[in-house]
Amino acid sequence: MPSFDIVSEVDLQEARNAVDNASREVESRFDFRNVEASFELNDASKTIKVLSESDFQVNQLLDILRAKLLKRGIEGSSLDVPENIVHSGKTWFVEAKLKQGIESATQKKIVKMIKDSKLKVQAQIQGDEIRVTGKSRDDLQAVMAVVRGGDLGQPFQFKNFRD
């Protein structure tokens, strides 16, 4: 029986490359001359700390970071940015989290979407991923289209496609 897994992962090496590219762009931009602005990627907690001297510059840095992430193949929706920007001393910063794995509420929504599509497939939750099995390849590809079309706030990848 054909099957595949639905996962949500971010390649940390690509994220590191995007952070390095964004740092290089900030160093060369005229509007960030003589300004303390930086990006810090923490591999352990999977967060990116964006630091600058004012709140609007933090927002500009976030836009630069999103563009660089997109160029490296990481969707902007995989970056979870809190609304409030923290002010500490003379710097402003925000810690954006990279979304890894699928939360249980989102998993249930995906399984419900698959069941509501009336396709002849079975979806089962396995840890932080979802295994989908069906009799035909076409049904599985239709499930992929349903999951991509659903607006669930994070990107999904499809792995272990077996025939």
Curated annotation (Swiss-Prot):
This is Nucleotide-binding protein YajQ. InterPro entries: DUF520, UPF0234-like_C, UPF0234_N, YajQ-like_sf. GO terms for cellular component: cytosol. Signal peptide: none annotated. It comes from Escherichia coli O127:H6 (strain E2348/69 / EPEC). The gene is yajQ. Nucleotide-binding protein. The lineage of its organism: Bacteria, Pseudomonadati, Pseudomonadota, Gammaproteobacteria, Enterobacterales. It comes from the Bacteria. GO terms for molecular function: nucleotide binding. HAMAP family: YajQ.
